[in-house]
Design a protein with these regions (language model features):
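Glycine-rich beta-strand-centered segment in the early N-terminal region that forms part
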Residues: 1-24
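Glycine-rich phosphate-binding loop and adjacent beta-alpha segment
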Residues: 103, 146-218, 251-257
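Adenosine-nucleotide cofactor-binding segment
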Residues: 77, 93-147, 199-201
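Glycine-rich NAD(P) Rossmann-fold beta1-alpha1 loop
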Residues: 56-57, 82-86, 145
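Short glycine-centered segments of the SAM/dcSAM-binding site in methyltransferase folds
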Residues: 16, 74, 98, 159-160, ...
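C-terminal capping/lid region of NAD(P)-dependent oxidoreductase domains
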Residues: 216-222, 233-257
Length: 257
């Protein structure tokens, strides 16, 4: 909820909005560039809306801008039940891209399939069974090193491997012959340290291409649970269990949700 605006702002006090922040979001008030703000979609609570900007900006940037995903191309989403993964599944479904996932449990695989994933594998089982689902045109990967060699095998010719995290080691040994023979692209990507204009352009695209899909009922926030801000430590402890599907949100004022 906007409490103050600067000169020339297009927003007004009282507008229900959600925003992309570079940090500092666990606070009662934040200052944000008006170009990094979007309206809360009709029918959603503020808590639900808080779960949207970071994940949908990340997915749109990496799948649809950097990887230039085309309708019909196959996508593999590592950590498919995460906040980013759950947003990616929905966007893939909305834009005509069949997707598969790797996840941490059978329950999380079922969650992803209910959202629209075609299927996938549980990583504690046999990740190599992904070979039966390959080749993939695009892989969205927050894991990194431990999946690197597998990713090269799974990608189709001219495939794009978009690396957005390093949860599974920062170093890897790669067979560059596969990169050469299949003309593969490895794209490293970050969002938080991008400049203000880049984020403004990204949010303009989100407002045009993604936000209308909430009103159409084709996208929905995946809010696993809310915590009062005083219980932030408990929220981080739950996140650390690696059993959360979707997003956790800290709520400062219950009356505004």
């Amino acid at each position: 909820m906007i409490s103050e605006v600067g000169p020339g702002a297009s927003w007004k006090v009282g507008d229900r909005v959600c925003a992309l922040l570079a940090g500092g979001g666990m606070a009662e008030e934040v200052v944000v560039d008006g170009r990094h703000v979007l309206p809360v979609p009709d029918g959603l609570s503020l808590a639900e809306a808080a779960a949207l900007p970071e994940v949908y900006a990340t997915v749109w940037l990496n799948l649809f801008q950097l990887a230039a995903l085309k309708p019909g191309e196959k996508v593999l989403l590592h950590a498919g039940a995460s906040g980013i993964g759950s947003a990616a599944i929905q966007l893939c479904k909305a834009f005509g891209n069949p997707c598969w996932v790797s996840v941490g449990s059978a329950e999380r695989l079922a969650y992803c399939e209910a959202l629209g994933a075609q299927g996938g594998v549980v990583r504690n089982g046999d990740l190599d069974s992904l070979n039966d689902l390959a080749p993939f045109d695009v892989i969205l990967d927050p894991v990194g090193g431990s999946y690197a060699a597998l990713n090269l095998k799974l990608l189709a010719r001219d495939g794009r491997w978009v690396l957005i995290g390093l949860m599974g080691r920062r170093e890897a040994q790669l067979d560059l012959a596969q990169v050469l023979a299949k003309r593969l692209h490895l794209l490293g990507s970050t969002l938080r340290n991008r400049d203000e204009q880049f984020k403004a352009d990204l949010f303009s695209d989100l407002g045009q291409h993604v936000w209308p899909l909430f009103a159409e009922g084709r996208l929905s926030p995946q809010l696993a649970r809310t915590f009062a801000i005083k219980d932030a430590e408990a929220a981080f402890a739950e996140l650390a269990t690696n059993k959360v599907s979707g997003k956790l949100v800290l709520v400062i004022d219950e009356s505004l949700t």
